[in-house]
């Protein structure tokens, strides 16, 4: 009986995670820009501390980070409008 309860709870949790749409890029560190006069690319990032999307930039020479979105709409679509 107890095993059935654990199986049911696991299945319920799995369905909830799948339905919510887990987005790992939203859990990555936010964009915080570059030092000095380095080339920067500007866009949008999800800020976990504030729980919302904000403008940010990254240093082009390091490559595009995972928590970068071209528009506020893309950011909100992936990470939610918290």
Curated annotation (Swiss-Prot):
Keyword terms:
Cell adhesion impairing toxin, Cytoplasmic vesicle, Disulfide bond, Hemostasis impairing toxin, Platelet aggregation inhibiting toxin, Secreted, Signal, Toxin
Give yes or no: UniProt keyword DNA-binding. Answer: no
Cysteine disulfide links: 26-79, 34-59, 53-75
Where in or outside the cell is it found?
Cytoplasmic vesicle, Secretory vesicle; Secreted
The Gene Ontology terms for molecular function here are: serine-type endopeptidase inhibitor activity; toxin activity
* Signal peptide from the UniProt entry: 1-21
Q: Name one GO cellular component term.
A: extracellular region
Highest rank taxon of the organism: Eukaryota
Q: Where is this motif: Cell attachment site?
A: 35-37
Could you tell me in which tissues this protein is expressed?
Answer: Expressed in salivary glands.
Q: Give a short account of what the protein does.
A: Tick salivary platelet aggregation inhibitor that plays an important part in the anti-hemostatic strategy of ticks. Inhibits platelet aggregation induced by ADP (IC(50)=130 nM), collagen, the thrombin receptor-activating peptide, and epinephrine, although platelets are activated and their shape changed. Binding to platelets is similar for resting and activated platelets (Kd=50-70 nM). Acts by specifically binding to platelet membrane glycoprotein IIb-IIIa (ITGA2B/ITGB3) in a divalent metal ion dependent manner.
Protein name from the UniProt record: Savignygrin (+)
**Species name:** Ornithodoros kalahariensis
């Amino acid at each position: 009986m107890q095993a059935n309860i654990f199986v049911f709870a696991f299945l319920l949790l799995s369905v909830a995670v799948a339905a919510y749409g887990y987005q790992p890029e939203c859990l990555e560190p936010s964009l915080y820009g570059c030092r000095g006069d380095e080339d920067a690319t500007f866009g949008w990032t999800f800020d976990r501390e504030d729980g919302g999307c904000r403008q940010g930039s990254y240093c082009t020479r390091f490559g595009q980070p995972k928590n970068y979105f071209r528009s506020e709409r893309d950011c909100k679509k992936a990470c939610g409008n918290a």
